[in-house]
Amino acid sequence: MSENLKDEILEKYIPKTKKTRSGHIVIKTEETPNPEIVANTRTVPGIITARGCAYAGCKGVVMGPIKDMVHITHGPIGCSFYTWGGRRFKSKPENGTGLNFNEYVFSTDMQESDIVFGGVNKLKDAIHEAYEMFHPAAIGVYATCPVGLIGDDILAVAATASKEIGIPVHAFSCEGYKGVSQSAGHHIANNTVMTDIIGKGNKEQKKYSINVLGEYNIGGDAWEMDRVLEKIGYHVNATLTGDATYEKVQNADKADLNLVQCHRSINYIAEMMETKYGIPWIKCNFIGVDGIVETLRDMAKCFDDPELTKRTEEVIAEEIAAIQDDLDYFKEKLQGKTACLYVGGSRSHTYMNMLKSFGVDSLVAGFEFAHRDDYEGREVIPTIKIDADSKNIPEITVTPDEQKYRVVIPEDKVEELKKAGVPLSSYGGMMKEMHDGTILIDDMNHHDMEVVLEKLKPDMFFAGIKEKFVIQKGGVLSKQLHSYDYNGPYAGFRGVVNFGHELVNGIYTPAWKMITPPWKKASSESKVVVGGEA
């Protein structure tokens, strides 16, 4: 069935496109348990892709959630709107009185005259006006495609403005065309955060201090994660970047362990912080009970404190006991259902684990903007070829900080933890947790998706806003996991309950029986088309 499905997906493509897309579709089998997949390459022109741009990844994903910064988009107003609140990264004023600008959108609103004569003066004025009106902790300036094409020097403008107004002004050359997807923007943001922000704070380090990286507080996820972590006794030093303040990001070097939730968007910072400050990192998963429990136990092993380990087990027992009836109900209602997932660069994997605990079988999974290591595991990184698009992103080199580098976990203990299965500086990728016969599709487009829907008839299909309504017109439940359809949180123990109830309610709604999928309707080929009779 899997091979037939791949053939049917590729059948409609012209030969050149068929050859290109073939490598993006692989099947896990007993003979090839970790097949090489083509990822992080350009989308074929003309294909309806779900990907975003480098600007969206930089401003919209990584930097945008920092709530006391003013984020100025230097470009047309449409780019600003695209990254304004649509992802639902929640935030609230720090301690009830702090700054929170996430309800605002800031743009230089470039017009045709700015493209012809340059937008530098407009950007200077915008920075000064934003400072005088809001007095933020810092300002970010984000370049869009037109800015790169006309050559506005945003780095020089930011440097000059910073001296004039007395606060940090960071410029990000994240023009949309800088990479093949939003992943390029993540990398650009990571580089600047690492070189210009982290390590600039002066707070004292606290006991059991941790950072949560790649968590953006969609629907309040970070708050639920904080509740559990603080209940155990951890100090959540900084979350990058959901509900974050600029100061907390500055003090991210004051931690003993980094937890990486979204591997794709922030693994660069995790690696660089380990090199520069000696802070180890583990891949975590706070989506689904099994993932949460495994993560909490891995954390306790890293700290190796009997009291912390004891408290970890107590909290796990308390939290599971509180939701056990719900878990039993979800399994009763969802056992044997099937799902497909096509989300982001990590979420397909994290949610697959939660679905498995409900008894839901994942048939197809893929990522929008992943790299090969997100599919196959970090062990393949040395074999990944650097192409011309990747070279658009400046590589930075970090070295151990002479004053701040420290050995948090001795090397012999690191090896011991790795042998015990703790994912220190490691991520195994999604493929390893998929069963034989499942299909992986990278950069899935609407055609691929419609074939999957028609042939596999899954009970649910998790995707983004661009795909959601196409799926539901096919009579299949779709939840979009980029912004949670106005719901959430889905992380943490309480998040499992929220997600489970929404799935059960969605699956058993009678609305799906009232929808006729497009492929079951009479063909329109013989009807009136543009230009007259067919």
UniProtKB/Swiss-Prot annotation:
Query: Per the record, what are the reactions this protein catalyses?
Result: N2 + 8 reduced [2Fe-2S]-[ferredoxin] + 16 ATP + 16 H2O = H2 + 8 oxidized [2Fe-2S]-[ferredoxin] + 2 NH4(+) + 16 ADP + 16 phosphate + 6 H(+)
Is Iron-sulfur among this UniProt entry's keywords?
yes
Coiled-coil parts of chain:
none
The cofactor required is: [8Fe-7S] cluster; [7Fe-Mo-9S-C-homocitryl] cluster
Q: Does the keyword Nucleotide-binding apply?
A: yes
Q: Mention one GO molecular function.
A: iron-sulfur cluster binding
What is the main EC category here?
oxidoreductase
The record, for PROSITE patterns, names: NITROGENASE_1_1, NITROGENASE_1_2
Query: Where does this protein hold [8Fe-7S] cluster?
Result: 53, 79, 145
**One Gene Ontology cellular component annotation held by this UniProt entry:** molybdenum-iron nitrogenase complex
Q: Which GO terms describe its biological process?
A: nitrogen fixation
Keyword set, alphabetical order: ATP-binding, Iron, Iron-sulfur, Metal-binding, Molybdenum, Nitrogen fixation, Nucleotide-binding, Oxidoreductase
Note how many cofactor molecules are bound and how.
Binds 1 [8Fe-7S] cluster per heterodimer.
Q: Where does [7Fe-Mo-9S-C-homocitryl] cluster bind?
A: 262, 482
The protein's Enzyme Commission number: 1.18.6.1
What quaternary arrangement does the UniProt entry report? Tetramer of two alpha and two beta chains. Forms complex with the iron protein (nitrogenase component 2).
Q: Which NCBIfam families match?
A: N2-ase-Ialpha, nifD
Question: PANTHER family, per this entry?
Answer: NITROGENASE MOLYBDENUM-IRON PROTEIN ALPHA CHAIN (PTHR43457:SF1)
| Protein name according to UniProt | Nitrogenase molybdenum-iron protein alpha chain
> What species does this protein belong to?
Clostridium pasteurianum
Q: Which gene encodes it?
A: nifD
